[in-house]
Structures are given as structure tokens and as C-alpha cells.
Amino acid sequence: MTSAFDLTGRLAIVTGARRGIGFAMAEALAQAGADIIGVSATLEASGSAIEQAVTSHGRRFEAIACDFADVDAIAALGERLAVRPVDILVNNAGTIERAPAAEHPIELWDRVIQVNLSSQFVLSQAVGRSMLERGHGKIIFTASMLSFQGGVNVPGYTAAKSGVAGLTKALANEWAGRGVNVNAIAPGYIATDNTQALQDDPARSRAILDRIPAGRWGVGADLGGATVFLASAASDYVSGIVLPVDGGWLGR
């Protein structure tokens, strides 16, 4: 009997696939049988670590380099991907800029909103149209703990990730009845480049660990199961959720 989690023959786009959470998501999808189109701001045409990881599982990998802060580049990427028979879109690319709200430059605000929210809507719209025409598809956003909480010194990031949670629900309301499931994963405190400043701050890191019932920072592989679930037939009746993968952070 075929597993409901089997992704053999599926084509998945994963943005921000070069490292961190996106790398782990792409590899998990490949392990489940999907071929991968990896998109990142800087991604080698061949020979990248993520290509090696995907092909080690016997799956095909295609690399696309795209600057998510560039409005024109994102529009062109959407047009390029819209003609592909994409089954799964993982909107994971993101950035973070830290500064107190009273001093936060508008240029940084605009960049974070563009990369973390606007570009993801453009890609979802372009790829989503094709999915709607075919009557099936899975779209997964990477949300955040700051889709639920306010954070400190990251006003643009919090606004963007709150927007991602809202966009997930908005698209799900329109598309669930047409065969396209739209959901989000909200990682907790995961040990990646984006959280390096927190990991390097002994007091802040200790405070974070004290609140996580699991007692540790998450790692990219912790997102794999949730990603495969939301990308597979196992989640066909799941739409509009923001699924925390946080070691219990929000339950504390």
C-alpha cells in the first residue's frame, strides 16, 4: 500500500534552500520522493551542498539564483515557475534586520517586508494559478514564533511574519475548495544563522532554553516531518493552519 506521506513523482520548489531551515525542508521532501527546485539569493548552478543532499536520495535537483529583495527579479521568477508542473511550493526565503523600533530605518523595514512577505505572495500567486488550473497543490509558508508574539528590536520581521500567518489563512479560504492546500509552519528557536546573535548571547540563550519544555534549541531536521506532512496527501483536509514546531515554546 502506498503511504499517504509518499511524494514520489512530485515536484517541489523550496525557496531559501541553500542553508538552514530551507535546506532541511528540501532534503526532507527529497527523502520522501520529491524532485526539488531550490531557489536562493546565492546558489551555485551545480555542486552545492543542497544539490548533493537531494541527489543522494536519488532525486533530481535544479538550482535557481534569485534576489528576493528585487521586485523585478521576483516577478520574473514567478513567470518562470508558473509554467512548471509544480506540486509543492515551500515559501521559506527570509531575512531579519535588528534595530529598536524608534531607530529602525525605513529601508530595512521595506527590505524585510519585501523578502519575507511580498515576494512570497507574488510566488504563491504565480504558482498558485497553475495549481488551481490543475485542481491540486500544496503551498507551505515558513511563519515564526513572531507570527504569534511581538519580539524585541525586530519590528519589520514581526510585521512580516504576522502577515505570513494572515496570508496563509486568506489564501486557504479562497483555494481550499479548489484543491490547493495552503498552510504554514512556525519554527521555534532553531539553531541557524538567523538566530546566531541570540545563541551567542549567554543570558538571552539561557532565557530561551529555560522557556522551551524540550530543553534544547531546535535543529533544521526537526522541521522535516511537518514539511512532509503538509506537502503530502496526509494533509488533504488541512488548510489555513500555522503549525508550531517549537519544542513546546508556545505552550509554556
Predicted regions located by residue number:
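Residue(s) in the substrate-gating loop at a strand-loop-helix junction
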Residues: S144
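Conserved glycine-rich Rossmann-like NAD(P)H-binding loop of the short-chain dehydrogenase/reductase
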Residues: A34-A49
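C-terminal substrate-recognition "lid" of short-chain dehydrogenase/reductases
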Residues: F121, R178, R216-L250
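Conserved glycine-rich cofactor-binding loop
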Residues: L11, R18-R19
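Active-site helix of classical SDR
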Residues: S124, A160, T168
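Substrate-binding pocket helix/loop in short-chain dehydrogenase/reductase
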Residues: P100-A101, L108-I113, I208
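Alpha-helical segment proximal to the catalytic Tyr-Lys
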Residues: R129, N173-G177, D236
